[in-house]
Amino acid sequence: MAAAASPPRGFCRSVHWFRRGLRLHDNPALQAALRGAASLRCIYILDPWFAASSAVGINRWRFLLQSLEDLDNSLRKLNSRLFVVRGQPTDVFPRLFKEWGVTRLAFEYDSEPFGKERDAAIIKLAKEAGVEVVIENSHTLYNLDRIIELNGNKPPLTYKRFQAIISRMELPKKPVSSIVSQQMETCKVDIQENHDDVYGVPSLEELGFPTDGLAPAVWQGGETEALARLDKHLERKAWVANYERPRMNANSLLASPTGLSPYLRFGCLSCRLFYYRLWELYKKVKRNSTPPLSLYGQLLWREFFYTAATNNPKFDRMEGNPICIQIPWDKNPEALAKWAEGKTGFPWIDAIMTQLRQEGWIHHLARHAVACFLTRGDLWISWESGVRVFDELLLDADFSVNAGSWMWLSCSAFFQQFFHCYCPVGFGRRTDPSGDYVKRYLPKLKGFPSRYIYEPWNAPESVQKAAKCIIGVDYPKPMVNHAETSRLNIERMKQIYQQLSRYRGLCLLASVPSCVEDLSGPVTDSAPGQGSSTSTAVRLPQSDQASPKRKHEGAEELCTEELYKRAKVTGLPAPEIPGKSS
């Protein structure tokens, strides 16, 4: 996309604007900035005031700053530097255009509503200054607008429908080559002696974060770490040979040296590189057979939520959100605070929230457990509150995936087929019978025997004294009776969906069981796109389920506007909802 005519070759003074996409590999916008350029400056715009006032926590800021340091180090090896410019983009660019004589601005396409609005303002400023603008897509695998177009100009609202659409599309573009020193030789710029003072990567202290007592980072930011992790990740993929889901265990809950989600979120790792490295590995192992879509579950769910959010600026809230069912959640700030601070009295939930606050990451099934507990499982608090807490604490949280996941897990959108209800005792016990995970993050409970580690309130007083932890004194009592509240909340959700279905005469969801089933069986470490479920999920009896095909067809026929009309009828008055608190 160009906002002005391209300058003659050799006279182009380029600026590449890093936002996400914090990498030199597979960066088509950076390659475009280099093409025919006489000079190139790579910038990142950071507003210190925003950093000090935003709700984003210290772990995510640290990861970002580490990623910028790594990017600067990589550019140094190419005889260049990263220019971290302080301020707002709309204030910064008019000054830089004049000061540096910029003739071309390149950046990666941002599909999220806020990003598109910001970029439109910068494109306007560039056009007024006679600066060519080049935008390339590399943060998503597909052209999201094309997916929407193929779905009748509306985003697909089920993952199955999304898969059907992309299966008709061309494969994602292959990653472009990494930047090499020869490309930078002809477009060097003078680096001033005071560069670090003026354009250096700031410290956490400069951004207003206290660092006394800050534990070492569990996740090291940056492209260098991302590529090393990718290699390790693929080495671990021996299971691809038989394509068996890995079994869930206590070690699965800990931060893995092969984990990639924060690196994909910040663009330290290209999703296209990840996609094609998986592709190559599968074809090597399977002797050139075509990889199934399920191989890319992590990437495709990410793509699904990006598609759903791209034209929906209200995607992270209920009000005005055309795809969100308007469920009458309770407002309970005290209960929300206990959940967010890991003080619910359920060790499994509290250990997860403690890990999240300390490290900035939790396993995706742990996310399911705490999301269910906050929303439809136990506390009946809006998913919007969960979005805000995760946005503060989670390294890989972004607008689309974070909000989309919370709507999905709370049964507020994307047509959940089953009413999973993760048991805050049984799920943890099956995953880690010895309770090592709980003892790691809640050391005050380490004296309890495994028998009581997930429900210490049931331990005899003598056991509590021996463990030096009295429940109700040293560790809180459970804030709810899970068996009772989960049954009530399932009934509330059942009423909501029954009324929603009656409104147009469609069965959007299967009928809901009147009691919680606690099924036995192994827990599998599967992604949502691979049909994730656990032994502690509430599943519907097979005899009570509507045909999955019929349900999907009915759901997918709904256009966004029709769904919103239906969703509004679920704002039931309190007396009509069993268990509704005043």
Swiss-Prot record:
What are the Polar residues biased-composition ranges? Answer: 527-546
Q: What induces it?
A: Exhibits some circadian rhythm expression. Levels increase slightly during subjective day peaking at 10 hours. Levels decrease between 14 hours and 18 hours to peak again at 20 hours-22 hours.
Q: List GO BP terms, alphabetically.
A: circadian regulation of gene expression; circadian rhythm; entrainment of circadian clock by photoperiod; negative regulation of circadian rhythm; negative regulation of DNA-templated transcription; regulation of circadian rhythm; response to light stimulus
Question: What highest taxon heads this organism's lineage?
Answer: Eukaryota
**Cofactor(s) required for function per UniProt:** FAD; (6R)-5,10-methylene-5,6,7,8-tetrahydrofolate
Tissues expressed in: Expressed in the pineal gland.
Where does this protein reside within or beyond the cell?
A: Cytoplasm; Nucleus
Work out whether the entry's keyword set contains ATP-binding: no
Q: What does the sequence similarity comment in the record state about its family?
A: Belongs to the DNA photolyase class-1 family.
Q: What subunit structure does UniProt give?
A: Component of the circadian core oscillator, which includes the CRY proteins, CLOCK or NPAS2, BMAL1 or BMAL2, CSNK1E, and the PER proteins.
Can you say what this protein is called? Cryptochrome-2
- The protein's organism comes out as Gallus gallus (Chicken)
* Encoding gene per record: CRY2
